[in-house]
């Protein structure tokens, strides 16, 4: 049994992977908390990446919700943004209440209603999630904001139009910041989202052998963060790379608050390493894994064939260029968890991929990378400062 606590953090999520990998249980159930107290940078999608890893584990069992009846279950779903994607990801499992009773049938219609509200950016809070679930070949789980006729990805121009109200919702906290910070960089945000989501469409719907993945999640989250710099530093004091990023001289509002936009993209596909090498096991060392991530970030490198294949390398390289001088990007895939601080480590096109600098997310090292239990898929979480004045 794995119990997820309401005080979950990035470090505690890493511990969940270790707990899953080392468990001697024949069947591993997961118990969800009544609420998650703080959904900070990348936390929601980090949790969902773990849950995807659990779902794919051949010992995964039941998903327990801390509710006693249907009324409580609906309220729990409506008031906690981590619940809906958890239910959909675990739909092939037993989903039970605190008494061990299967409540999946009672959750079907409330989940559809939740999806409809999400589709109109009408959920509570200042976070905007957009989920695509690959259930089967019907494409019924795809977002109309990202797909045309629920089959083809929309182009960049259409995406910008489709997501305008999503960004507007994120900007509701402060209309002035939305106008100057978000709208001033809107094309940048859309470019990042389009490139990264295109990669999930092309490389994360099938496994490394080309077989369709069901169930499978591909998702986008937009989230606004506002805190004084010292509070960000305090919050991420265990991550030297983030501390350095926050101490790099941002322009703040008159109250001393830094405004940040988080853009997170998640998929539960094979991940960079398995896809690029077409391997099913991690029979290589961590330095080689990080090298493969660099290859995926390198212009013109690709694991796919044909014209669209070439776009993969260009796309991820373009993301780094778009973030240059501004953003912070974390990449968690396979057994690696790395980052690139584009503010303190500016973009430069290198002659070979090995020269691209990536740091370990936990220890900040450029060469001594932590080996974690393998995670399914790929998570990219980006911090982008609003009202940043380029020097």
Question: Could you describe each region identified by the protein language model?
Answer:
Residues 1-25, 56, 81-100, 105-137, ...:
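Flexible, glycine-/charge-rich segments associated with ATP-binding catalytic modules
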Residues 259-263, 378:
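Short beta-strand element(s) in the Bergerat
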Residues 36, 61-74, 335-337:
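Short beta-alpha junction loops
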Residues 181-254, 317-323:
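Conserved ATP-binding N-box helix of the HATPase_c
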Residues 2, 36-42, 168-194:
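Conserved short strand/loop->alpha-helix "switch" segment adjacent to the catalytic nucleotide/phosphoryl-transfer site
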Residues 154-178, 280-303:
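Helix-loop-beta hinge of the Bergerat
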Residues 267:
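Acidic ATP/Mg2+-coordinating residue in the GHKL
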Residues 26-40:
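Short, glycine-/small-residue-enriched flexible loop/hinge segments at domain edges that mediate gating
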């Amino acid at each position: 049994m794995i119990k997820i606590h309401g005080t979950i953090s990035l470090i505690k999520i890493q511990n969940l992977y270790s707990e899953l990998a080392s468990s001697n249980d024949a069947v591993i159930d997961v118990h969800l908390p009544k609420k998650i107290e703080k959904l900070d940078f990348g936390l929601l999608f980090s949790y969902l990446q773990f849950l995807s890893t659990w779902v794919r584990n051949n010992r995964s069992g039941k998903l327990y919700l801390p509710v006693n009846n249907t009324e409580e279950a609906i309220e729990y779903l409506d008031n906690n943004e981590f619940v809906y994607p958890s239910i959909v990801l675990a739909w092939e499992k037993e989903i039970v209440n605190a008494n061990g009773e299967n409540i999946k049938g009672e959750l079907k219609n409330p989940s559809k209603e939740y999806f409809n509200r999400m589709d109109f950016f009408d959920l509570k809070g200042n976070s905007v999630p957009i989920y695509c679930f690959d259930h089967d070949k019907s494409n019924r789980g795809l977002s109309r904001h990202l797909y045309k006729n629920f089959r083809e990805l929309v182009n960049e121009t259409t995406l910008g139009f489709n997501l305008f109200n999503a960004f507007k919702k994120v900007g509701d906290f402060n209309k002035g910041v939305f106008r100057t910070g978000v709208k001033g960089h809107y094309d940048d945000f859309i470019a990042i989202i389009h490139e990264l989501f295109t990669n999930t469409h092309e490389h994360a719907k099938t496994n490394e052998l080309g077989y369709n993945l069901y169930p499978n999640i591909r998702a986008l989250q937009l989230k606004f963060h506002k805190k004084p710099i010292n509070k960000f530093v305090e919050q991420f004091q265990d991550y030297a790379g983030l501390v350095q990023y926050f101490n790099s001289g941002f322009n703040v509002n008159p109250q001393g608050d830094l405004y940040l936009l988080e853009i997170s993209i998640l998929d539960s596909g094979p991940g960079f390493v398995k896809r690029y090498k077409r391997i099913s096991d991690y029979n290589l060392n961590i330095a080689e894994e990080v090298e493969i991530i660099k290859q995926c970030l390198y212009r013109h490198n690709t694991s796919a064939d044909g014209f669209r294949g070439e776009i993969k390398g260009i796309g991820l390289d373009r993301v780094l260029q778009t973030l240059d001088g501004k953003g912070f990007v974390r990449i968690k895939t396979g057994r690696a968890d790395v980052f690139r601080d584009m503010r303190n480590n500016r973009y430069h096109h290198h002659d070979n991929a090995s020269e691209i600098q990536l740091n370990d997310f936990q220890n900040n090292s450029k060469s001594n990378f932590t080996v974690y239990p393998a995670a399914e898929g790929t998570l990219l979480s980006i911090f982008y400062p609003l009202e940043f004045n380029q020097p």
